[in-house]
Amino acid sequence: MADVVLGVGTGVFIITLIWILTLALTIILSRATGPTKLGIIPVVLLALIITLVLVFFPRAAEVPAPQRAAQIVDMFFIGRYVLLSLVSLVFLAALFMLLPLHFLEPIYAKPLRTH
């Protein structure tokens, strides 16, 4: 049942697409002149046959088989923590390199006004 969208399977979408294309082709062929207009009949019959095959010969069972719960396994667990430790070390190194610049910044005295 992994291919269920909006509660229906892919077959419903295929049938809908087939009939939309059939409708478009019949509209196009109805505007034609002469014997080309008769092309509507095979288009509709082909869509009808495909629809009947999809309805009466489904590939999956009507009741889906019970599925067991999927077990989620983190395969990149060690790599993620190695990456986290490297980023933490770089952050701490940058922090300790910036702290002396912050604390040792000279503060100059303002000159007193003498009258």
UniProtKB/Swiss-Prot annotation:
Instruction: Point out the coiled-coil segments of this chain.
Output: none
Q: Name one GO biological process term.
A: regulation of heart looping
Q: Mind telling me which InterPro entries this protein's record contains?
A: Tmem218
List the effects observed when the gene is inactivated.
Morpholino knockdown leads to the formation of pronephric cysts and hydrocephalus, features consistent with a ciliopathy.
Keyword list, A-Z: Cell projection, Membrane, Transmembrane, Transmembrane helix
* Subcellular locations according to the entry: Membrane; Cell projection, Cilium
How this chain sits in the membrane, per its record, is:
Multi-pass membrane protein
Q: What does this protein do?
A: May be involved in ciliary biogenesis or function.
Name of the protein this chain belongs to: Transmembrane protein 218
The scientific name of the source species is Danio rerio (Zebrafish)
